[in-house]
């Protein structure tokens, strides 16, 4: 059988390459002039996410410009609560809003609308038909804990206090929210795979706000369930877990969830991660997004340190979180050249 030209996909399956594959979280976004032009023509962010032609174009823009090894689907983690029946909108300059906030049993009052995900599947099909053969196509979803923090509070927050309070005060009600998110997430990711993504990533952006016991209950257990069910349906599709802020709990996450690869945020020492994580587990990361903004010698040193930290482990170069809007395009070009040894 002919070997796949998709180096990033092969890395997720345990291969090592002379040149480290790379992509960047939020690589399709506001730092790109072509994205800003398209976003302005389409109006709101959510409208852009639900327009298959436009969302496919946004997904493809950084591939055309930079030739990344991976393309990440352009969408948002909050399409899941929208499909579960919450109202979702984005306030200019303030971020997402969801109504009603899921307190006092409000989950039971929601009327599910899974058809809201259909445009995302259409986007996946469009992108899959358009990508270069060497480019790995990555789908994604938010992990249950992170999605639940928005659903309970009705908005983003700095400390996730509303969800944390509910998890302590009424774990049965909070667990029902987690279960509803997990069930739809399996369906959603399976749909993405069926339409053509090569691998998927679970984003747990607020995993770092939990104690070890809560982390086990609300991060590890739900993600393990998603991975197990997804693998039963699609055993050959790699799953990347990204529990941002997990720190010393990363090893337990890696060992207990069953993910095929793990993403590191910028606070993790890559040398520590290489020593602490299960042998040969592929890792992804973990450049500080602000180092990419700064550029210069500091950027070069940070890139080199990460590349040197994984001498025998499969590694995908990425950021420790999403690229920020004021990142100079020239710095991204320099990053790619340095990672690829140009």
Swiss-Prot record:
**Where found, per UniProt?**
Cytoplasm
Which keywords appear in this protein's UniProt record, sorted alphabetically?
A: Cytoplasm, Decarboxylase, Lyase, Porphyrin biosynthesis
Q: Which GO terms describe its cellular component?
A: cytosol
- Subcellular location, principal: cytoplasm
Instruction: Write the Enzyme Commission number(s) for this entry.
Output: 4.1.1.37
Pfam annotation, one family: URO-D
Question: Reaction catalysed by this chain?
Answer: uroporphyrinogen III + 4 H(+) = coproporphyrinogen III + 4 CO2
What pathway does this protein act in? Porphyrin-containing compound metabolism; protoporphyrin-IX biosynthesis; coproporphyrinogen-III from 5-aminolevulinate: step 4/4
Q: Which GO terms describe its molecular function?
A: uroporphyrinogen decarboxylase activity
Q: Which domain of life is it from?
A: Bacteria
Q: Which residues form a coiled coil?
A: none
Q: What class of enzyme is it?
A: lyase
- An individual GO BP term: protoporphyrinogen IX biosynthetic process from glutamate
**Subunit composition and interactions:** Homodimer.
Official protein name in the record: Uroporphyrinogen decarboxylase
- Organism the protein comes from: Sphingopyxis alaskensis (strain DSM 13593 / LMG 18877 / RB2256)
Q: What is the lineage of its organism?
A: Bacteria, Pseudomonadati, Pseudomonadota, Alphaproteobacteria, Sphingomonadales
Q: Which gene encodes it?
A: hemE
């Amino acid at each position: 059988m002919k070997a796949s030209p998709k180096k990033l996909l092969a890395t997720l399956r345990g291969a090592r390459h002379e040149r480290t594959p790379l992509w960047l979280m939020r690589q399709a976004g506001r730092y790109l002039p072509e994205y800003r032009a398209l976003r302005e023509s389409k109006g709101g962010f959510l409208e852009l996410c639900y327009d298959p032609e436009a969302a496919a174009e946004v997904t493809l823009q950084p591939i055309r410009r930079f030739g990344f090894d991976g393309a990440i689907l352009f969408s948002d983690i909050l399409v899941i609560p929208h499909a579960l029946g919450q109202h979702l909108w984005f306030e200019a300059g303030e971020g997402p809003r969801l109504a009603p906030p899921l307190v006092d049993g409000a989950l039971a009052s929601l009327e599910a609308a899974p058809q809201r995900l259909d445009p995302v599947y259409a986007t996946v099909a469009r992108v899959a038909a358009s990508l270069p053969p060497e480019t790995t196509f990555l789908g994604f979803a938010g992990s249950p804990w992170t999605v639940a923090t928005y659903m309970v509070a009705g908005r983003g927050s700095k400390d996730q206090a509303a969800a944390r309070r509910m998890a302590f005060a009424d774990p049965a009600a909070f667990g029902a929210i987690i279960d509803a998110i997990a069930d739809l997430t399996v369906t959603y990711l399976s749909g993405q795979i069926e339409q053509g993504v090569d691998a998927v990533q679970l984003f747990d952006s607020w995993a770092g706000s939990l104690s070890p016991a809560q982390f086990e209950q609300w991060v590890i257990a739900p993600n393990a369930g998603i991975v197990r069910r997804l693998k039963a349906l699609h055993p050959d599709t790699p799953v990347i877990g990204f529990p941002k802020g997990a720190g010393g709990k990363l090893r337990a996450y890696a060992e207990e969830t069953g993910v095929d690869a793990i993403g590191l945020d910028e606070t993790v020492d890559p040398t520590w991660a290489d020593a602490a994580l299960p042998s040969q587990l592929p890792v992804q990361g973990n450049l500080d997004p602000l180092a990419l903004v700064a550029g210069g010698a500091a950027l070069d040193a940070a890139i080199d340190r990460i590349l040197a930290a994984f001498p025998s482990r499969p590694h995908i170069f990425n950021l420790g979180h999403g690229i920020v809007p004021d990142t100079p395009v020239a710095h991204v070009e320099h990053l790619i050249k340095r990672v690829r040894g140009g």
